[in-house]
């Protein structure tokens, strides 16, 4: 199985990082995205608007990929990152911890069905992931092993919508897409692509993570952030159509193309139906599921039952937020 490459530049950053005392609870949170904001980030954008209404200054920055966003968190350029940096924590001993599960892994291997009728046809063939160390790469590693194949050249293209366009233009032939872009590709190019079987996958796709010292010194800000995430996720799980309504009310992503705008309701309805947005923010149960998945996928070393949750997660914030919103 092809072994992923992990955050080489970050090892130096983590090792050389000095740790000056931070200002006590600044009521500000700087969040780094390793992707552009689009349909699948609308739930986060809605929650962040609610955080702002509670007096927290929110700054959202899009980086070119998750590696760069992770480095920004480690170096203190932003406070919070989004991803699943288990390998970064284990291999580089970066001083960061996951603290909230945003979504579970729901990606689909969409391929040109004439070229790749099944998994075996992909043996030795190119495959495209979102980024190094991403959930899509872990999923690809696992599925390749389960199907007895090894991919050929691996490329990394951040952004599911970017990969969808590349598929339809014929620039790539096989990749993972999220729900919205899988539906879009199937609608716009009927009969050309199909989704290969994946079986059951139970793992985090995106989680919030931050430097442990920042989490401990900004407890009130973190509490507000997580309370609003919990409430927003629960609102969406009760009524997925609220996302489109809130987007319009708040003026979010005003330049979203019409074809993607049409995917808002289908995306969130399907995502809710597949339990993509946890009501509880994850925590210990999510960590244990992640250990099983990411060790099997080759992104974590060791036996899942021997890994310590506290080495990767800081559980106190989500537990306090759940208590505050009753559940």
What are these regions (language model features)?
Residues 288-327:
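Conserved C-terminal helix/tail region of periplasmic/extracytoplasmic solute-binding proteins
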Residues 58, 151, 254, 301-302:
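Residue-level detector of short coil/turn "hinge" positions at structural boundaries
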Residues 1-8:
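Bacterial N-terminal signal peptides that target proteins for export
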Residues 217-301:
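Secondary-structure end/capping motifs
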Residues 8-18:
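Bacterial N-terminal signal peptides
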Residues 24-159, 164-169, 173-179, 193-202:
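Short, glycine-/small- and polar/acidic-enriched structural segments
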